[in-house]
Design a protein with these regions (language model features):
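A general, composition-driven signal for non-globular sequence regions
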Residues: 1, 17, 29, 152, ...
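N-terminal capping/linker segments that flank leucine-rich repeat
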Residues: 1-139, 312-406
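Generic preference for well-ordered alpha-helical elements
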Residues: 7-11, 21-31, 139, 165, ...
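Core hydrophobic positions of leucine-rich repeats
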Residues: 116-123, 140-150, 166-176, 192-201, ...
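Positively charged, low-complexity intrinsically disordered regions
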Residues: 200, 232, 258, 292, ...
Length: 406
């Protein structure tokens, strides 16, 4: 008999329908790929897994579960387990939610007690996700929710209520196969962190976020970085009065041709490094409304904006003295000449030959195996002596040596 804790309806249902004297269930810890075996007897539904079970439909087996999974998310996402039926006592070597085994479709139902959906599908190799029967208002954290879902191409989140969400950082990060994303239902008035929100969505062709309320956002680092297929972004309704971090905001948006930043307020921003780096298709940019008096880092801000010939900057465009290396590195000569005529600036901001090596990396909060919060790098940027930039993705956050060039 298992530890006596309050009964769970789902387990009660299972136990009452056990035909054999006892049954071995395989429980997979959802986001850690760990396996546990649990022995249940008839009417034995009082156990330590109360409200930490992700259920599947009764009768589903290994043969069909990969095509259509139904999961029930309970109170604490970090301790959820997935029930897997197995009549014999052989060990199941792999979790079917691992990166290298695709799942066709997942339907999700979320319990009322849930407060956080952080890292819910982290690195889950799934193609389709649908949320059903869900309109809870008390979710506060959706960070890393779909991060690293490289195979995901169909995502229905129209039932998600984001009314009280405060954290959306890395929510869709590295969803490389997503071409369309409908988030017109999102309410974001309470969101504080949007850093790396769409980072690495390299297949995304259109993105309508005209409904976004960004009044309380403080961090927009890398929000659209590596969205290499996006051709235009209308951010004219964005309120950025509280934002302090705009590092790499549009970095590596190679296809971006139109960018409306007319409503951007940057009085509180302290870091603009790499902000437009490698926006190679951008020809016109108006940042005449920018205020940079608090900015302490502008390194490589317009690096490799090779097509940019028309840049409107404010009359009082203050460039920080200490971290201004390569602001206009590898920009077209026409733009460089215009900037030189308008302002008396240090030549290092135009320098195409960068001395030495430096390492920058985006960092985001994640939970390690012990459930403790820690900071880990997701991306590592290597700047060479000749203005060449290689950006690497960290394949395995447990082993920082495993890198893949992007």
């Amino acid at each position: 008999m298992l530890e006596n804790i309050r009964s769970d309806f789902f387990l009660k249902f299972l136990c009452q329908h056990i035909k054999d004297k006892d049954k071995i269930l395989r429980l997979f810890q959802y986001n850690k790929c760990l396996q546990k075996k649990v022995k249940l007897s008839i009417n034995d539904y009082r156990n330590k897994y109360y409200q930490t079970i992700i259920g599947i439909k009764p009768g589903e087996t290994k043969s069909n579960i990969r095509e259509n999974v139904f999961i029930r998310i309970s109170r604490n996402c970090y301790n959820n387990y997935h029930i897997y039926f197995n009549d014999d006592k052989t060990e199941i070597k792999r979790n079917y939610l691992e990166h290298n085994e695709k799942i066709g479709k997942i339907k999700v139902f979320i319990d009322y007690q849930v407060k956080s959906l952080k890292a819910l599908f982290l690195y889950c190799n799934v193609e389709k996700i649908y949320f059903i029967k869900y309109n809870r208002k008390d979710i506060t954290d959706m960070s890393l929710m779909f991060y690293g879902c490289h195979s995901l191409f169909n995502l229905d989140i129209s039932k998600l209520n984001t009314e009280n969400v405060r954290y959306m950082n890395l929510m869709f990060g590295n969803c490389k196969c997503l071409k369309n994303l409908n988030i017109s239902n999102f309410r974001t008035e309470k969101v504080e962190k949007m850093n790396l929100l769409f980072q690495g969505c390299s297949s995304l062709e259109k993105l309508d976020i005209s409904n976004f309320n960004t009044n309380n956002v403080t961090n927009m680092m890398g929000m659209f970085s590596f969205c290499s297929n996006l051709k235009k972004l209308d951010l004219s309704k964005f309120k950025t009065n509280k934002v302090t971090n705009m590092v790499g905001l549009f970095e590596n948006c190679y296809s971006l041709q139109k960018l409306n930043l007319s409503n951007f307020k940057t009085e509180e921003v302290t870091n603009m490094s790499y902000m437009f780096s490698f926006c190679t298709s951008l020809k016109f940019l108006d940042i005449s409304n920018f205020r940079t008096n608090k900015v302490t880092n502008m390194k490589y801000m317009f690096n490799h904006c090779e097509s940019l010939v028309n840049l409107k900057i404010p009359k009082k465009f203050e460039i920080c003295k200490d971290n201004s290396l390569g602001i206009f590195t590898n920009c077209c000569e026409e733009l460089k000449e215009k900037i030189k005529k308008e302002k008396n600036l240090d030549e290092k901001i135009f320098d195409d030959r960068l001395c030495g090596f430096s390492f920058d990396h985006y960092r985001s909060e994640l939970f390690n195996d012990e459930g403790k919060s820690e900071y880990i790098p997701f991306f590592l940027r290597l700047n060479s002596c000749y203005g060449a930039f290689n950006t690497y993705e960290l394949i395995n956050w447990k082993d920082p040596t495993k890198l893949k060039i992007l």
